[in-house]
Amino acid sequence: QWREIYDLSSVQGVLAQAWDGMQLLPEAMRPPRALRLQWAVNVERIEKVYRRQERAIARLAAFYREHAIPMMLLKGYGLSLFYPVPEHRPCGDIDIWLFGRQPEADKLVAREWGVPVDVHKEHHTTFDVDGIMVENHYDFVNKETHASNARLERLFKQYAAQPGESVAVAGVAVYLPSEQLNALFLLRHAAVHFAAINIGLRHVLD
């Protein structure tokens, strides 16, 4: 039974949250020691990846700040800050919004860091920072697939013009989306996952 819980929580992207919940149980109700050790090792791996991403975000935000470009975090890391243990919410790519200054920012990254920027994506460009993929959004959704996306995009950009709170990531200030933008964008993102692949428990928790 515990092995099934472990495997399922891993597939659903909530392995570290399940670990946190397991700590609340009496010793007699916890899984066997061998499984706990395996679990702990993988939670530690999640934490290390989170710290790497945190450093990459801080480096990127500091670089943009030198050029007077504000940066907003979308999904991932920004959402983790709402969790009881932020570093236990796994983050994939770093999704950013630069308030319409994406083309300028990409040229700066390519010129000053020598980092190749992939422009052949649907609604963002991509590049690598310290081994972590960055998605630099010029649109929030792919406007070419559905007419409704174009209407949504106008709404996303309207909300994005007024960012939410500013938080410090390793001492560097970044913006988070407003509550309105977060709610709409996350629901849209989850709907796309549900239609194209599936929707995991991590999306529900977000």
Regions found by a protein language model. Name each.
Residues 1-92, 98-206:
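Conserved NTP-donor binding/palm subdomain of two-metal-ion nucleotidyltransferases/polymerases, i.e.
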